[in-house]
């Protein structure tokens, strides 16, 4: 068990969005969250990312979110970049774990960077373009690249195939199937979920 929620309830203001629910991630599961619109799927992702908290109930036996160890999570955000005047390379280098460009770890990171960048349909020359020169859909792709480069223990994806063409979607499917960590995803693309998820959780 990597993460577990037992009898959790989450409210936003006076509205209860998720009531008395259970949720669990085992190992490197690839989990599809499905359900009607407005049932709280995106809210669950925000909870797992630490942006929201479960309601406190002193009478409940539930202990909130239990984890087997300290975990890192990564959520694909809609408003991805605070400064769009810098280049793609400048933005992505912020998350590079090794500032020394001659370090072996830096070399490995840059190889992964190149693989992801071209995998999402960009040319290497576009790394030098400013973020403001890319469309909203392209910026979403770049935000996803930044997230994947961080290799979080739990990857949280909300409609990751939006703005992706068929070829790029298929590339992402293969990447996620081989991803070493857990993935929790929300998508209206059932074909994408069928090809990437090994567990379905209905809300």
Whereabouts are the PLM-identified features?
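ABC ATP-binding cassette signature C-motif
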Residues: 1-203
């Amino acid at each position: 068990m990597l993460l577990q929620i037992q009898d959790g309830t989450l409210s936003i203001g006076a509205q209860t969005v998720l009531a008395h629910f259970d949720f669990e991630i085992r190992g490197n599961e690839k989990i599809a969250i499905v359900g009607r619109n407005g049932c709280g799927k995106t809210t669950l992702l925000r909870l797992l990312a630490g942006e929201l908290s479960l309601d406190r109930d002193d009478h409940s036996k539930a202990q909130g979110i239990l984890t087997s160890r300290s975990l890192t999570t990564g959520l694909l955000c809609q408003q991805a970049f605070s400064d769009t005047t810098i280049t793609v390379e400048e933005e992505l280098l912020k998350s590079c774990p090794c500032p020394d460009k001659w370090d072996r770890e830096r070399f490995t990171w840059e190889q992964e960077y190149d693989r992801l960048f071209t995998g999402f349909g960009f040319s290497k020359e576009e790394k030098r373009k400013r973020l403001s020169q890319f469309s909203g859909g392209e910026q979403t792709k770049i935000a996803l690249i930044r997230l994947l480069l961080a290799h979080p223990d739990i990857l949280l994806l909300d409609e990751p195939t939006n703005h992706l063409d068929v070829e790029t979607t298929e590339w992402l499917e293969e990447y996620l199937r081989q991803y070493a960590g857990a993935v929790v995803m929300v998508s209206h693309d059932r074909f994408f979920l069928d090809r990437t998820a090994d567990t379905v959780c209905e809300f």
